[in-house]
Amino acid sequence: MRVRALMTAALAGMAMLATQTTATAQQAGDPLSEKQWGLAQLRAPEAWSTSTGAGQIIAVVDTGVDLGHPELASKLVPGATFAACGDRPAPCGNGDWRGVDGVGQASDVHGTHVAGIAAAAANNGVGIAGVAPDARIMPVKALENGSGSFEEIGAGIRWATDHGANVINLSLGAQPGTQLLTLLGQGAETKDAIAYAREKGVVVVASAGNETAPLCDTPSWEAGALCVAATDSAELHSVYSNLTLKPDMKAVAAPGGSSLNGCDGDVWSAVPRGTGSAKCGQGDYDSLAGTSMAAPQVAGVAALLGAQGRNADSIEQALMKSARTPILGARGVFTPLYGYGVVDAAAAVAQPM
């Protein structure tokens, strides 16, 4: 069984799933940041005076990353490739999006986009700003041509855990119904790897899924993973997003875009150089939608919290207790649409340690 990256098919054409002063300064340093409505929804700029994620490593277990992208090149720590490495997953590359054959697949722009959302460089004169602009990125390529096996993904999670990751982002998921198979012991490699990461004190953030299903997909369904649903620019539950139901109820929501309201209604981030789409792209940048785009927003806020010296349990509690439920205005109250609410970076970093 294969697990897929999770950006919306409608947008991508493939089955993959501050204060005013601060904002103005950010736009001057990052020209596309004026399109990043997600940062405002997260209240990330208001959190940066407290934490920018310095010293934290976010592992992006995904399709690999463009290692030379100007938003990411200066921020990378050594990564690894587990996709298409032979019969048994073992590192056979450095996490580059082009894979072992050196050929970048169209669907494999996904990992660079996810990495940029989480931790793109800020105030560098180009593009965007990441949620945790001073965090580092560990590129782990476990998906090739948009999909990978439970074994490859599990190996990537374990490798990232053993090589210093503080946060692991999983913007990927299996088809609805796979939850039952994992409960019966199939596909246990990813489930067991998530448990291993949590035992080692790593925060694991995963996409809820894009099937409008009632449950979090595997692997966000698994105990130890924080399931992330998507919101649109109006802070409403995105039409494609799964609900946040799972046994341990560890779930939140974050900006993922609508897939219906044009390029600027979705999430702008980096893509491998020169691969921006004709519809929305600007060469090295593009706008995509999906719970894949929501998860790294939360991974970035987790890095902001980790840089404050919090452990994994404290990070998860700060994320959930400070999250806000749209319309109701409540904080830290579980609903199926939003989990414990839309993540609020400024409120999270202000939570007691």
Where are these regions (language model features)?
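Extracellular S/T/G-rich loop segment that most often corresponds to the catalytic His/Ser-adjacent loop
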Residues: W221-R310, A346-A350
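Short helix-loop-beta-strand segments that form the rim/entrance of peptidase-like active sites
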Residues: D62, G125-N145, I168-L172, N311-A323
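Secretory targeting and sorting signals
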Residues: M1-A25
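Active-site core segment of subtilase-fold serine proteases
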Residues: A28-D134, A155, D162, A174-Q175, ...
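Structural detector of well-ordered beta-strand residues that form the stable sheet scaffold
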Residues: V77, M138, V203-V205, L226-C227, ...
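Substrate-binding/access-modulating region of protease and related hydrolase catalytic domains
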Residues: V140-G224, L236, A278-P296, G329-L337
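Solvent-exposed loop/turn segments at secondary-structure junctions
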Residues: T63-L67, F82-A84, A122-N124, L143-S147, ...
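C-terminal subdomain of the subtilisin-like protease fold in secreted/lumenal serine endopeptidases
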Residues: Q36, R43, G164-S171, Q175, ...
